[in-house]
């Protein structure tokens, strides 16, 4: 399954990710203000414990007409098989 997104859908997804990032940074800022009364060494240790988790894999979509699809079919099949192989190897 290869998802195909329009440009406006990609923009919407990017905007959602930016909003999530802004909310997270605001939460971190509020926490750091609350923790501000701690010893500076404790604050540094607290910063070192932060873990960043990715919420979703990156997806790229494109549109092709039938002529373009015929022209690039072999290359697309090769890319797809590489991705599927690497996914299967990572799952093992």
Swiss-Prot record:
It comes from the Eukaryota. Its main location: secreted. It holds the Pfam family Motilin_ghrelin. GO terms for cellular component: extracellular region. GO terms for molecular function: hormone activity; motilin receptor binding. Disulfide bonds: none annotated. Residues 12-49 are annotated as: Disordered. It is found in: Secreted. InterPro entries: Motilin_assoc, Motilin_ghrelin, Promotilin. Keywords: Cleavage on pair of basic residues, Hormone, Secreted. Belongs to the motilin family. Plays an important role in the regulation of interdigestive gastrointestinal motility and indirectly causes rhythmic contraction of duodenal and colonic smooth muscle. This is Promotilin. It comes from Equus caballus (Horse).
């Amino acid at each position: 399954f290869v998802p195909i997104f329009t440009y406006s859908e990609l923009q919407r997804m990017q905007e959602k990710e930016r909003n999530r990032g802004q909310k997270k940074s605001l939460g971190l800022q509020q926490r750091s203000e609350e923790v501000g009364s701690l010893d500076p060494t404790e604050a540094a240790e607290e910063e070192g414990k932060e873990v960043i988790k990715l919420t979703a894999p990156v997806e790229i979509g494109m549109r092709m007409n039938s002529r373009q699809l015929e022209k690039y079919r072999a290359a697309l099949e090769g890319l797809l098989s590489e991705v599927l192989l690497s996914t299967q190897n990572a799952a093992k």
